[in-house]
UniProtKB/Swiss-Prot annotation:
Its EC number is 2.1.2.1. The gene is glyA. It comes from Serratia proteamaculans (strain 568). This is Serine hydroxymethyltransferase. It catalyses: (6R)-5,10-methylene-5,6,7,8-tetrahydrofolate + glycine + H2O = (6S)-5,6,7,8-tetrahydrofolate + L-serine. Homodimer. Belongs to the SHMT family.
Length: 417
């Protein structure tokens, strides 16, 4: 018999110590990695529930195992909420991650060797959109598109490439692009050659749910997202579609299970259901509006301090500092800011002279700091601290002074009160 008082601390002190240290790190560091966020205690309650014990291969009402009557309710709640939140008429909540969701789309609609058009990773795309180091870049013939000298998607060039290469699929979406994508224009280009338009909205799903960023669901054939990042739910994936194409929906379902996965993670799906309900609350819209305001406020400060921002600004939750003119690498900036308890990630910039392991840029995002209560005044101050560190990257006194300021504001604005 398992006793409920069993705990990690008494059984595995070494593991528990590392877990506790991570809690302290999250509370005492300012998190600016654009893909990270803090999920609610309700979501964590779902993920730590007895649902983790249940195997449920198949879909609600069509399982291969018995005893699924209650997890069917859980999954159907998640499906219905996802459809309502994003205006879709199809949703699959089973993908274990955004990458798994993307590969389910590829499996459903492509054959190895088919041509796809995806945003260049160095211009803000994602590994799973055809990067040569990713399986998507090995299985398919990839034609990359990028951004112009103003940092915007060049739709005219995209249309020309589409006409030249006749891809079977055009991929929209990004991991480090701060502009607004014209989904209708992308669909127009896809339709002109009879291609699928597939949009990976993982980075902006929360903003889209709140009406702060344009929704691709009415325009794309298929949309995927993660359920963490701006959506602030558990780590996982989601596939959406609209248009009533039942044949497409069957292909997508089969590509997830049994095509790419076995049993779904029911405790995570419960967490997704909770997060999707939270995203329907008025407070969530206010939060996402603040995420965008905070990103713009930070950009204003770094530009005033003489730093270059790719695209010249931001229209979402992130921006990319281009450090080429500062003779700094992204790796150096990442490390120095880390010593000041400010967590960012090094990131390639367009036409980056450095390798992906070094880079010439830093990606900065505001979902996590906004989640803990930062407003415009707070992030303006924070942006100034970032510039102070980057201006004096080898001055440990500056880094220590900044770290003290970080600890003070983190104590004032905790993640979990």
């Amino acid at each position: 018999m398992l006793k409920r008082e069993m705990n990690i601390a008494d059984y595995d002190a070494e593991l528990w110590r590392a877990m506790e240290q991570e809690v302290v790190r999250q509370e005492e560091h300012i998190e600016l990695i654009a893909s990270e966020n803090y999920t609610s205690p309700r979501v964590m309650q779902a993920q730590g529930s007895q649902l983790t014990n249940k195997y449920a291969e198949g879909y609600p009402g069509k399982r291969y195992y018995g005893g699924c009557e209650y997890v069917d309710i859980v999954e159907q709640l998640a499906i219905d909420r996802a459809k309502e939140l994003f205006g879709a008429d199809y949703a699959n909540v089973q993908p274990h991650s955004g990458s798994q969701a993307n590969f389910a789309v590829y499996t459903a609609l492509l054959q190895p060797g088919d041509t796809i058009l995806g945003m260049n990773l160095a211009h803000g795309g994602h590994l799973t959109h055809g990067s040569p180091v990713n399986l998507s870049g090995k299985l398919y013939n990839v034609v990359p598109y990028g951004i112009d000298e103003k940092g915007q998607i060049d739709y005219e060039d995209l249309a020309k490439q589409a006409q030249t290469h006749k891809p079977k699929m055009i991929i929209g979406g990004f991991s480090a692009f701060s502009g607004i994508v014209d989904w209708a224009k992308m669909r127009e280009i896809a339709d002109s050659i009879g291609a699928y338009l597939f949009v990976d909205m993982a980075h902006v799903a929360g903003l889209i749910a709140a009406g702060v960023y344009p929704n691709p669901v009415p325009h794309a054939h298929i949309v995927t997202t993660t359920t963490h990042k701006t959506l602030a739910g558990p780590r996982g994936g989601l596939i959406l579609a609209k248009g009533g194409d039942e044949d497409l929906y069957k292909k997508l379902n089969s590509a997830v299970f049994p095509g790419g996965q076995g049993g779904p993670l029911m405790h995570v799906i419960a967490g997704k259901a909770v997060a999707l309900k939270e995203a329907m609350e008025p407070e969530f819209k206010i939060y996402q509006q603040q995420v965008a305001k905070n990103a713009k406020a930070m950009v204003e400060v770094v530009l005033e301090r003489g730093y270059k921002v790719v695209s010249g600004g931001t229209h979402n939750h992130l921006f990319l500092l281009d450090l080429v003119d500062k003779n700094l690498t992204g790796k150096e900036a990442d490390a120095a800011l880390g010593r000041a308890n400010i967590t960012v990630n090094k990131n390639s910039v367009p036409n980056d002279p450095k390798s992906p392991f070094v880079t010439s840029g830093v990606r900065i995002g505001t979902p996590a700091v906004t989640r803990r209560g930062f407003k415009e005044a707070d992030v303006r101050e924070l942006a100034g601290w970032i510039c102070d560190v980057l201006d004096n990257i080898n001055d440990e006194a500056t880094i220590e002074r900044t770290k003290k300021k970080v600890l003070d504001i983190c104590a004032r604005l905790p993640v979990y009160a």
